[in-house]
Amino acid sequence: MGFCFCLSSGGSTDKSQIYEITDYGQENAVLYSDHHVVPQNLGSVSSLAGGKGLNQDAAILHLGYGTEEGALCGVFDGHGPRGAFVSKNVRNQLPSILLGHMNNHSVTRDWKLICETSCLEMDKRILKVKKIHDCSASGTTAVLAVKHGNQVMVANLGDSRAVMIGTSEDGETKVAQLTNDLKPSVPSEAERIRKRNGRVLALESEPHILRVWLPTENRPGLAMSRAFGDFLLKSYGVIATPQVSTHQITSSDQFLLLASDGVWDVLSNEEVATVVMKSASEAGAANEVAEAATNAWIQKFPTVKIDDISVVCLSLNKKHNPQPQI
């Protein structure tokens, strides 16, 4: 059994299991547990709508994923007319696809194969519904992290980001970035796109942002180089193959944090780490980072509409100690 706590609307029991195609629901931020209650000391998740209308982000923290002490974190930043559809469907289906492949392989040895196979299957599922939901110019980023034993395994598509936060030997806050922001500005990403006849150009109005365009048409102008969906550009170098990595958890590592670019566009890794370490509780850390990013948007870009902001924060060295949800 699982317990699903949708942060936008309160708690509700969920009889489904992740081993099937679990539907986490339609809320933007979901905290899910395979225990009867949600352990409040293990982490938090938050998703705040920006100033562009519908919140197209989705986020998940699944406690007890795969094993009792396991966890899955995911942030999905949708874009385009069907961005919210894509991000929530990936959030709702990819964890069960991934777990199915994890059950059939050695997780630590075959993590790259597991992720690549799972992401390809997920992308095909989105393509299959194109007659109902046209995702030719819509898609989502995905940054996914699985805590498995004393390791954190990460998969990344696009420009959402994962960081590890802890304390150094001299007591200072430390932060390590676990993913690369996969954008057309990365030389190897641009090279792949151009080899497949896609174009990488910036608009005159925003010369600092490189985008991906069709060979002979000035559309769609995608600001990332890897994504689910975005089928207009799949023949021109945009791929749904994740960049993967594995990281050993040490005694100095305290938190794993994932966030959409609505955070990273305005806050540095170090600023985010400081907010987390100063947070009064694990249960509030994600929302405090999201609020800090919102305030930074207002200060730094007062005339620009705030982006959607999603954050997942997991405590790494605490055991499950479930407390009933009131």
From Swiss-Prot:
Transmembrane segments: none annotated. This is Probable protein phosphatase 2C 61. The keyword Metal-binding applies. InterPro entries: PP2C (IPR015655), PPM-type-like_dom_sf (IPR036457), PPM-type_phosphatase-like_dom (IPR001932). Mn(2+) 1 binds at D77, G78. Belongs to the PP2C family. Binds 2 magnesium or manganese ions per subunit. Its cofactor is Mg(2+); Mn(2+). GO terms for molecular function: metal ion binding; protein serine/threonine phosphatase activity. The keyword S-adenosyl-L-methionine does not apply. Keywords: Hydrolase, Magnesium, Manganese, Metal-binding, Protein phosphatase. It comes from the Eukaryota. SMART domains: PP2Cc. It catalyses: O-phospho-L-seryl-[protein] + H2O = L-seryl-[protein] + phosphate; O-phospho-L-threonyl-[protein] + H2O = L-threonyl-[protein] + phosphate. Residues 42-316 form the PPM-type phosphatase domain. It is an enzyme of class 3 (hydrolase). Its EC number is 3.1.3.16. Pfam families: PP2C (PF00481). It comes from Arabidopsis thaliana. Mn(2+) 2 binds at D77, D261, D307.
